[in-house]
Curated annotation (Swiss-Prot):
SUPFAM superfamilies: Translation proteins (SSF50447)
GO molecular function: rRNA binding; structural constituent of ribosome
Family: Belongs to the universal ribosomal protein uL3 family.
Name of the gene this protein is made from: rplC
Region called Disordered, residue ranges: 125-164
Gene3D superfamilies: 3.30.160.810, Translation factors (2.40.30.10)
Function: One of the primary rRNA binding proteins, it binds directly near the 3'-end of the 23S rRNA, where it nucleates assembly of the 50S subunit.
Name this protein carries in UniProt: Large ribosomal subunit protein uL3
A Pfam family hit: Ribosomal_L3
Keywords: Ribonucleoprotein, Ribosomal protein, RNA-binding, rRNA-binding
Organism this protein belongs to: Prochlorococcus marinus (strain SARG / CCMP1375 / SS120)
Keyword Ribosomal protein: yes
Length: 219
C-alpha cells in the first residue's frame, strides 16, 4: 500500500511503449524513506505517518532534530513529510518506504517547487502582448493601462503586473507511473514535473476520484 514518498528529480528522458511511441517522462530517485513517527488520534488528534528522506551531515541539522530521528534509526535525514492514514497500526516505526510500494500504471500527484525566474516583466510572467516596435512607438514592453483614473484612484489588488516569477509550490496531478525500478530506487513518471534537476519532490497516490479505482482506490 502506497501512502507517499519523497524523492529527487533527476531529469527528463523518453520512454517507448509497446507500439514504439515515444513518451516524455521524468526520472525520479525516490526513497528509501524511513518512518520517523506514527501519529494517532489519541495522542495527536489525527492519524498520520511521518517519513524522512535524504542523507545529511550531522553538523547541518540541530540537536532536537537529531534526537527526533534517533527514535527511529541511526541515519541522519534532511527532509520530512507526513501523510494522513486511517490506521497507523499497519505501519511500524523505523520501517522503510520504497518505490516497491507503487505500481506501474498507477496515477500519482507530484508536488515540488517551480523554477525561480526572479523579478520578471509582464510578457514573461503573464504572457502579455508587446506594443508596436516601429512608427515612433515607445511602448514596446510596457504594461499599458492599469485601471481608471481619479475613481478609484488606486490599483486593485490582484492586478497582473511585473514581479517575482516562479519559486512556488506546484502540484501536478494525475500523472502515470510508467516504470518502477526497485534496484535503483527509480520512478519513471509520464510528463514533466515541477522544479529543476536535484530538487525535492513529494509523490503520493492521486486523489481524483476514479483514477486508481482499478487498484482498489486510495487508502
Amino acid at each position: 500500500m502506497s501512502i507517499g514518498i519523497l524523492g529527487k528529480k533527476l531529469g527528463m528522458s523518453q520512454f517507448f511503449d509497446e507500439k514504439g511511441r515515444s513518451i516524455p517522462v521524468t526520472l525520479v530517485e525516490a526513497g528509501p524513506c524511513r518512518i520517523t513517527q506514527l501519529k494517532s488520534s489519541a495522542t495527536d488528534g489525527y492519524s498520520a505517518v511521518q517519513i524522512a528522506f535524504g542523507a545529511v551531515r550531522e553538523k547541518l541539522i540541530n540537536k532536537p532534530f537529531q534526537g527526533h530521528l534517533a527514535k527511529s534509526g541511526d541515519d541522519l535525514l534532511r527532509y520530512m513529510s507526513e501523510y494522513r492514514v486511517k490506521d497507523v497500526g499497519e505501519f511500524q516505526l523505523g520501517a522503510q518506504i520504497t518505490v516497491g510500494d507503487f505500481e506501474e500504471g498507477q496515477k500519482v500527484d507530484v508536488s515540488g517547487t517551480s523554477m525561480g525566474r526572479g523579478f520578471s516583466g509582464y510578457q514573461k510572467r503573464h504572457g502579455f502582448s508587446r506594443g508596436p516596435m516601429s512608427h515612433g512607438s515607445k511602448n514596446h514592453r510596457e504594461p499599458g493601462s492599469t485601471g481608471a483614473g481619479t475613481t478609484p484612484g488606486r490599483i486593485y489588488p490582484g492586478k497582473r503586473m511585473a514581479g517575482r516569477y516562479g519559486g512556488k509550490k506546484i502540484t501536478t496531478r494525475g500523472l502515470m507511473i510508467m516504470k518502477v525500478d526497485s534496484d535503483k530506487n527509480l520512478l519513471v513518471i509520464k510528463g514533466s514535473l515541477p522544479g529543476k534537476p536535484g530538487s525535492l519532490l513529494n509523490i503520493r497516490p492521486a486523489k481524483c476520484v476514479g483514477l486508481n479505482s482499478s487498484k482498489g482506490g486510495n487508502k
